[in-house]
Swiss-Prot record:
GO cellular component terms, semicolon-separated: bacterial nucleoid; cytoplasm
Originating organism: Yersinia pestis
HAMAP family found in the cross-reference section: RdgC
Gene: rdgC
Name the record gives this protein: Recombination-associated protein RdgC
Domain of life (superkingdom): Bacteria
Amino acid sequence: MLWFKNLMVYRLSREVSLSADEMEKQLSAFSFTPCGSQDMAKTGWVSPMGSHSDALTHTVNGQIVICARKEEKILPSPVIKQELQDKIERLEGEQHRKLKKTEKDSLKDEVLHSLLPRAFSRFNQTFLWIDTVNDLIMVDAASAKRAEDTLALLRKSLGSLPVVPLTLENPIELTLTEWVRSKTLPAGFALMDEAELKAILEDGGVIRCKKQDLFSDEIAVHIEAGKLVTKLALDWQERIQLVLSDDGSLKRLKFADTLRDQNEDIDREDFAQRFDADFILMTSELAALIKNLIEALGGEAQH
């Protein structure tokens, strides 16, 4: 089981029926196929259980997990530039004239097409967890762009997907700043030793702290000077560690060994049973963490 490393959280903005059986059919029309000789990139769905299953969806207790794979061809720009330059010089020598810009652009396309079949591929996978009980969608992505790209593929596959980023009643950075300033955190949360503080003004400074006592006078001075806490490392119930950002994303999730070891009694050879047990454990813990975080940060914005 792949334990999520990051979470971008989205709210289903209206009731939608997301049945795994129906989704299976819809996703299969957009299943992953590798790049052809002239493709720069391809994205599609693969089984979240890897080679252990052909199913594109996996559901347990109303929690659905799916996985998008992306293949990108790697063509380093210096290689393209050199190949293009060689071609331009050869043609200009043969024709005894300078090539026009349109001709050079056309040559660049030719160069790309000739290099593509020989290019290496880079693959990445993005897992997406749909919590049909709480009407939330979580993407294991460190950037909003990657999360949005994955949601766009899901929207295309399903026909529509009414989701918005989870938004809170109060600006997150104001709440985080108050936690550090007052040296008081909500029940269940403990401060760790990492943070980012930013000046309110756009051209103001940014301070990134690691292995730092965040309740120290040094940090207090920065807050008094008007800096806001925009990232904060937290420990939740000694079960999950994370870095919470002012955009609501959860990065660098780290599950406690005591948590991850709970299913050690299940034989690793029984992949399906272990996958289910780990998925149930991970989603129940993360759902509880998200619920606690929303409450601690002042509640969800009412639209």
